[in-house]
Amino acid sequence: MNITFLGTSSGVPSLTRNVSSLALKLSQSSEVWLFDCGEGTQHQIMKSNIKSSQIKKIFITHMHGDHIYGLPGLLATLGLSGNSEGIQIYGPSGLRSFINSSLKSSFCKLSFPLNFVEVENFASENKILFENNKIKVNCACLKHKIPAYGYRVSEKDKPGIFDIKKAESLKIAPGPIYSELQQGKKVVLADGRTFDGKEFCGPPRKGESFVYCTDTVFSESAVSLSKNADLLVHESTFSVEDESMAYEKLHSTTIMAAKTALLSNTKKLIITHLSPRYTNKNAITPSDLLKEAQKVFPNTYLAKDFLTAEIK
């Protein structure tokens, strides 16, 4: 899996950073999941390597405008492009009303169904939000001025590496049989021989895990959600020098994000959602924010619009 940042600014866009949005590209699939959709997100998608037609799920963290104002326009565009499969939208209660009223007020009728899932109960009861045979999604309550939720996407373990040479040495012909063996299934060949796929595969490969936490001040639930994750994307609205504002507005400092990564044993941290007050022309720059976080959690990176990063 990999992610592409479509917006990395907090509150309002700047000349170099749009407001919040991130695209997750699933492994061995053309499917894309979108996390937050601030104003101008569809323009950012057009400038990226993401195709809007690939978007199948949208996850919204909370109902502040810099995370949702791009939704009506994006959905309308998808409707014009002939998307007929439908989109699953996950988020707080109130999201359905916002989208439906926006579309109704602008006389926009979509050509595909929207399926809404309200996440409150899933977060409070620690229930799995989505699951199939390859992946599962969990969510957790964060600490912000309005209800906000973090999301974790976890791949299930993958089959071990298939030993082709062993299969060839046993004169097993290449083809669909190899696929079944790689999945650990028992197969019977045309000549009557029986093989157990587990004998041809190495140990299972651990699936990748990605966590997205914004907007929030430091939160123990974010630590729990991020436990042993491969990649944590966490908001860092403020420098540690502006910690008082972080507590006032219930946003995170660089140190809070780094502390979350450290306590959760996350492997890699990317900080995002930076206040526009930090520019290369000001006393505190984005590079300074990165250095602050790296003092606590060295394997930290700084998000920027259109940055693509592998989960592992």
Swiss-Prot record:
SUPFAM superfamilies in the record: Metallo-hydrolase/oxidoreductase
Name used for this protein in its record: Ribonuclease Z
Catalyzed reaction equations: Endonucleolytic cleavage of RNA, removing extra 3' nucleotides from tRNA precursor, generating 3' termini of tRNAs. A 3'-hydroxy group is left at the tRNA terminus and a 5'-phosphoryl group is left at the trailer molecule
Class of the enzyme per the UniProt entry, highest EC level: hydrolase
EC number: 3.1.26.11
NCBIfam families reported in the protein's UniProt record: PRK00055.1-3, RNase_Z
Highest taxon listed in the record's lineage: Bacteria
Cofactor binding mode and count: Binds 2 Zn(2+) ions.
Keywords from the named record: Endonuclease, Hydrolase, Metal-binding, Nuclease, tRNA processing, Zinc
Entries under InterPro entries matching the protein: Metallo-B-lactamas, RibonucZ/Hydroxyglut_hydro, RNase_Z/BN
Key word Nucleotide-binding present: no
Coiled coil regions, renumbered to chain: none
Alphabetical list of HAMAP family matching this protein: RNase_Z_BN
GO molecular-function terms, A-Z: 3'-tRNA processing endoribonuclease activity; zinc ion binding
Residues annotated for Zn(2+) 1 binding in this entry: H62, H64, H144, D215
Organism encoding this protein: Prochlorococcus marinus (strain MIT 9301)
